[in-house]
Structures are given as C-alpha cells and as structure tokens.
Amino acid sequence: YMQKLVTYGEDNLALKALRAVQAYTGCKAGAAIHLLKRVPIQAGLGGGSADAAAMLLGLNRFWDLRLTQEELLNIGATLGSDVPFLLQGGTARGTGRGEILTYTQSPEPHWLLLAKPKVSVPTAAAYGRFNGKSEATKKTIDTVLSHMENNDLKSAFTSSANTFEELLFPDHEELVICKEFFTSRGYPTIMTGSGPTMVVLLNKPMEALQLQEEIKAAGHDWLSLITKTCTQEDLP
C-alpha cells in the first residue's frame, strides 16, 4: 500500500535533500538511495521530512562535507518546516513556520499506540481550511511545556489541542470514531499533524496489544503501530 504512494522522481523529499546539498556545496558526487518506509505515508507523522533529514545527515557524513549544524538546519528549512526538528529530535516548541525551535526538557520515554484510519486528507487541503481562528489557540503552550518538563505527559496530552481536529472531524466521521474509541477507554488521545493518525498515550506496552485486539474485534480497519517517545540521547 505504502509503495503505491511513494514518488520516485525529483519531487521525493529524499532526492530533494540530495539536490539541495549539491546546490549548496557544489559537490557533484552521486548516491544510490534505498528508501525503506517504516513511517506510514500521508499520516501526519512527518515521514517524508524524516527521509529528508536522514539524507542531509547521511550525505554530510558520506561525502565528508563537514557542514555545520546551522548549515544543515538552514538547508533543511528550505525542504520543509518539520525538517529542522527532525534533524535534532528531542522536545521543542516550534514558531514561525515551525522551523524556529526552542528546546525544552524531554519527558521520560512513554509507550504510544499510533492508529491510522483509512481517511485520506492531503496536507495542502487540510491547511486550506484554516482561517486563523481556533479553540486550540486558547490552550497555552506554556502549560503543555510545563507538564513536559515535570515529566507529566498525561497532563500534557490533556492540555493540548489540534486545530485540525476542529477542521476535519465534521466531514470525517471515521476520525471521530477513532478518537472516541480510545478516549472512551480512558486513554489520552490526540490527532497528530494534519491527520489522520491518532496518538494514544499508554501506561505500558501490553495495553497496546490489548487495544490492537479490541480494534480488530470491533471490526475497524485501522493501521496500528506500537512505539514510544524518545529523547535526543536516543538518536544515532
């Protein structure tokens, strides 16, 4: 399924990253790119941006370019607003287009379940609905960050809001069903990015296995993945 959605031409972000490095450095070296997708596509999880970030880091090493972190961040910002964050990881507040980052302490790793309904919402179409007004703006990012710093990810989840839920839920009942499936069971849940993936906060990994069984028993055809948060120290 994912392979059908991957583009292999010049519009692929991994190849765009290579071209951007060549343009910036004047390096004429080439590279054979083997792209193994593990992050679901069109899921609001930044998979394409992560590909670009990995390419920037890899090319800097393999071509021995010795680009500084600042140079990599600047190149990354030209590729996408998420790329600078994905070059560094951790926990950060994004301003501007999301490329201006202020880092804060990461909470301890927590287990998560990612649930992706079969709802297609192109990012551009989702952003096209935004009119600058949102209930989410009333949620203070300072409160969320404070909970993060106190290692209280549950309170951070419940204090957070995603504007795209307001914009997309009225026209996509499956998104509402998906979120309520988890919140009705007491799990803090929020849609990530422009959707449609739901991020479900767990207490222990066995809960994820139980939820996957319940999803199947309820007849929902959702992709679900078990993962956990990470800190900058966890990155290679």
Task: Please describe what each predicted stretch is.
Residues 1-29, 40, 228-235:
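N-terminal beta-alpha supersecondary unit
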Residues 199-201:
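Short hydrophobic/aromatic beta-strand micro-patches
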Residues 88, 93-188, 203-216, 220, ...:
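Conserved, helical-rich catalytic subdomain that frames metal- and/or nucleotide-binding sites
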Residues 43-69, 85:
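DPxDG-like acidic metal-binding loop motif
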